[in-house]
């Protein structure tokens, strides 16, 4: 019970067991909601925009990482799939 006397695994300042603080993360903002011009430019032919949301292996980056809202993530995925089907974006990179 020696840990309880010293504050236990959780320190008095909110540190966790391994010294990490319970910090609040900065909320990600949807780039398409913030910039309407970018949303208007979202098209399967605009490979420069679509490449930002695809990994180097050809996978679509999930919205929890990019910060896009659900509405725009679905639209983005639709345009990426269109671009892949006509050959502007690769399905996978070897």
From Swiss-Prot:
Keywords: Ribonucleoprotein, Ribosomal protein, RNA-binding, rRNA-binding. Gene3D superfamilies: Ribosomal protein S18. The gene is rpsR. GO terms for molecular function: small ribosomal subunit rRNA binding; structural constituent of ribosome. One of its GO terms (biological process) is translation. Belongs to the bacterial ribosomal protein bS18 family. This is Small ribosomal subunit protein bS18. It holds the Pfam family Ribosomal_S18. HAMAP family: Ribosomal_bS18. Binds as a heterodimer with protein bS6 to the central domain of the 16S rRNA, where it helps stabilize the platform of the 30S subunit. One of its GO terms (cellular component) is cytosolic small ribosomal subunit. The keyword Ribonucleoprotein applies.
């Amino acid at each position: 019970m020696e840990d309880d006397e010293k504050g236990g695994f959780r320190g008095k300042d909110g540190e966790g067991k391994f010294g990490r603080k319970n910090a609040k993360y900065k909320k990600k903002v949807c780039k398409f909601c913030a910039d309407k011009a970018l949303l208007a430019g979202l098209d399967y032919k605009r490979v420069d925009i679509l490449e930002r949301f695809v990994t180097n292996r050809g996978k679509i980056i999930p919205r929890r990482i990019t910060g896009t809202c659900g509405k725009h993530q679905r639209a983005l995925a639709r345009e990426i799939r269109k671009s892949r089907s006509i050959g502007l974006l690769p399905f996978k990179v070897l």
